[in-house]
Structures are given as structure tokens and as C-alpha cells.
């Protein structure tokens, strides 16, 4: 099932609601409209971004003109994940992995231990990624999160995980079909009550779009959307179907470096990047 493309880009969620100033601003003002991620199959990947309005904030992330990029990968681990990890190791770049634990990727869950040992951030994306299931009710969503935490607990310290990304983004409208018009509002409030931070993205690789875009197309998509942005949270996928993302990744990293960006995990960004990433 496809959804119409909409202008705008989701970025910070409740971080944007509480604009944090200091060495790093945790939210970015509304960005200019352009192409967004499209969703092919709402029960699985890819994610979709919908129009959102981030809390107003200065675009300068640090007050000194420093540019920051967070590379984020959804829907893994999979057979593609080792390729991504190898590039990140070679380039000495941290990333944030929003993991799931569906039937088709459970055998790859031990890779989460490798991600953790390599200094990457593990965050939550639900176990099943099935919209009909997770967005049926708040109880269904948190039950799915509980299943994910249980599945990944042998490979990482789940007590330390405080970040998540809602499938479809925090302002998705698909969820209304299953849980009513207030389902996302309720889930965001509950996430905050439970001590979670939720984050979307403002740069989309469109790597999970229909037709399996080439590595060159993925590279161009990212560059197009990252142009003139001081803070970039890049949405990519490390699924079996997105091996071209792994092929594009070295060039993507090189471009951000050439443009003077500093690489951070989402948590490092949240902490104003007080913990220096490997490449700094």
C-alpha cells in the first residue's frame, strides 16, 4: 500500500517540545519542503515521514557554527548489518541503530552485541514493526516494545536504552487507522512518562523505497536533503533488502566529513556531544 508524498520532514519529537539550548540545540526549526520517504508496505519497512512542525530554534547547533550529523539505521540487524559495521569501523564513525526483532531477523540479533562493543548506540524500533499490531492500542505498542527488549537483552544492556523511534515517525497518520486519531499523542506522552526520548529524522536516504534505489541514488538523496542543514539526522536502513545502502555509506561519510560535519550518536547529540565521537 502506498501513501502520497508530503512536503516537510519530521525531526525532533519531545526533544523539540523542550528546546534545549547550550553547547548544542536539541531541535531544529521547520525545514524546507522536499521529497520524503515513501512507504510501500505499512506492515514492514520502510518507514514514512509525514509533515511535522518542529519547535522553533536556531539552526546553529552549537553557537559556533559547528555542523553535526547522526547516522541512524532502522529495521536491522540483518545480513546487511556487517557491511555497515565494517564501513563504520574503517571510517571510525559512530551510528545509532533502531533495532527490531521480527521473525525474519531474529537470527541476526547477536550482531547487536557487536554494535554495542563497537561503541554504537542501540535504540528501540518495536519488535514486529507491524502497524496493525503495534498501533491497535497503547497497550499493544508497549507489549511489542517489551517483546523487543526481551529479545535483545542477551546482547546489550537494555536498562541503558532510553531512545526510540516510532515506526512511521512520531506524527504518522497510518496509526489512526488502527488506534484512532489520538494514538500517537497518547504514545508520545506515555513514552515521556516512561523516561524515553523519541526521535525522527530530517534527512531520508529513501533507500527502502520501491524499486530498490541504487547506491548512487541513495547518495544523491542524502546529499540533496542535507544541503544547507547544520544538524542532520539521517534515516537509513540496514535490512536484507537495502544492501545498496551499505555500498553508498563510504561516500556518504566522506561527503559529510568534507563538509565539516561532526559525527555523533543520537545520545551524544542529546548530551550536547560532550562525549567526543571517535572521529573528533
Residue ranges: model-predicted function:
Residues 40-161, 271-272:
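Active-site beta->alpha N-cap acidic-glycine motif
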Residues 1-70, 86-95, 154, 202, ...:
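Terminal accessory/targeting
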Residues 129-235, 239-255, 261-262, 268-269, ...:
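Catalytic domains of cell-wall/extracellular-matrix polysaccharide-remodeling enzymes
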Amino acid at each position: 500500500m502506498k501513501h502520497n508524498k508530503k512536503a516537510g520532514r519530521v525531526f525532533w519529537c519531545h526533544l523539540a517540545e523542550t528546546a534545549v539550548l547550550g553547547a548544542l540545540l536539541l531541535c531544529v526549526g521547520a525545514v524546507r519542503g522536499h521529497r520524503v520517504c515513501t512507504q510501500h508496505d505499512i506492515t514492514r519497512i520502510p518507514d514514512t515521514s509525514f509533515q511535522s512542525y518542529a519547535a522553533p530554534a536556531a539552526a546553529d547547533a552549537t553557537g559556533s557554527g559547528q555542523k553535526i550529523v547522526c547516522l541512524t539505521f532502522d529495521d536491522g540487524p540483518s545480513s546487511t548489518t556487517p557491511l555497515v559495521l565494517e564501513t563504520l569501523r574503517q571510517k571510525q564513525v559512530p551510528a545509532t541503530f533502531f533495532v527490531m526483532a521480527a521473525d525474519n531477523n531474529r537470527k541476526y540479533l547477536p550482531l547487536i552485541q557487536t554494535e554495542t562493543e563497537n561503541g554504537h548506540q542501540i535504540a528501540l524500533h518495536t519488535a514486529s514493526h507491524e502497524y496493525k499490531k503495534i498501533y491497535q492500542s497503547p497497550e499493544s505498542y508497549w507489549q511489542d516494545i517489551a517483546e523487543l527488549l526481551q529479545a535483545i537483552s542477551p546482547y546489550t544492556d537494555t536498562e541503558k536504552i532510553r531512545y526510540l523511534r516510532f515506526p512511521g515517525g512520531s506524527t504518522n497518520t497510518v496509526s489512526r487507522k488502527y488506534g484512532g486519531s489520538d494514538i500517537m499523542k497518547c504514545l508520545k506522552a506515555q513514552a515521556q512518562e516512561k523516561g524515553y526520548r523519541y526521535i525522527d529524522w530530517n534527512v531520508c536516504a529513501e533507500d527502502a523505497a520501491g524499486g530498490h534505489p541504487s547506491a548512487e541514488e541513495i547518495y544523491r538523496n542524502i546529499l540533496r536533503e542535507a544541503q544547507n542543514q547544520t544538524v542532520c539526522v539521517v534515516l537509513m536502513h540496514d535490512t536484507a533488502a537495502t544492501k545498496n545502502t551499505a555500498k553508498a555509506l563510504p561516500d556518504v561519510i566522506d561527503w559529510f566529513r568534507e563538509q565539516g560535519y561532526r559525527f555523533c550518536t543520537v545520545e551524544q547529540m542529546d548530551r550536547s556531544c560532550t562525549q567526543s565521537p571517535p572521529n573528533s
